[in-house]
A protein has these predicted regions:
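Conserved, mostly hydrophobic/aromatic
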Residues: 2, 10, 40, 58, ...
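C-terminal helical cap(s) of enzyme catalytic domains, especially alpha/beta-barrels
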Residues: 186-207, 213
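Active-site beta-loop-alpha junctions enriched in small/polar residues
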Residues: 15-17, 61-65, 92-96, 120-124, ...
Length: 222
């Protein structure tokens, strides 16, 4: 369907048979975790065969509940499928922030696997150590939470550094805004978020910024 629609990248989730073992207690044998990544490869290699056949890429969103949910699980997921080119990542920094993962470093280290970009923001609210990162079974927007999703540009994601990193790796794919904010009306927040993201999409230079000085120096000494 994606190919018929002219779409070359599909964003989605993989699922995970080992997510219930996240807490690692009771102790989980390493073999169980390894079997989980093997299960991922067994299920997804045939799917990726179809993607390859259609010339379409799959951009997995690094997200809790999935086989690749943070930095090292992303490394391991790629290893499990022998780094197939059909499989890459949807870079969504909102889920990295509350896990204390550097979203800019993720771009740099997975430069050839950033297939899609989701602009979604997170604001951290540690509350002097009262709230943890797992949400405390509190609903979105509850001020007691340790973090929450907010309109893009209103949180703690280092957006300028992130877009500079995307420019540096030559990213030219889709950029979408995934808007969530329990404390802001979407008809106000979504257009504001769009304007904010557009303000970061400046043209990259075609030459070194000091090239003009070099030319001037050359001209003076000619």
């Amino acid at each position: 369907v994606a190919r018929k629609l002219g779409v070359d990248t599909v964003v989605g989730f993989t699922g995970s048979s080992i997510w219930p073992y996240l807490a690692m207690f009771p102790p989980v044998p390493a073999s169980v975790i390894e079997a989980g990544f093997d299960d991922f490869a067994t299920r997804w290699n045939p799917i990726l065969d179809v993607f390859d056949g259609e010339g379409v890429r799959f951009a997995h969103e690094v997200h809790p509940g999935e086989i690749a949910y943070d930095y090292w699980s992303s490394v391991r997921a790629l290893d499990a499928i022998d780094h197939r080119e059909a499989f890459g990542f949807n870079w969504d920094p909102s889920h990295m922030m509350w896990q204390n993962i550097d979203p800019v470093g993720f771009i740099v280290d997975f430069a050839d696997r950033i297939y899609h970009v989701d602009c979604k923001d997170t604001r951290m609210r540690p509350h002097n150590g009262r709230a943890g990162v797992l949400g405390s079974h509190l609903p979105w927007g509850d001020p007691r939470r340790g973090w929450d999703f907010v309109s893009t540009g209103h949180g703690d994601v280092p957006w300028e550094d992130s877009f500079r990193a995307l420019d540096a790796i030559g990213y030219a794919g889709p950029i979408s805004i995934e808007w969530e904010d329990a404390g802001m009306d979407r008809l106000h927040g979504a257009p504001q978020a769009l304007a904010y993201v557009r303000s970061l999409l400046w043209p990259v230079p075609t030459a070194s910024f000091d090239a003009a000085f070099s030319n001037q120096t050359t001209g003076d000494t000619a």
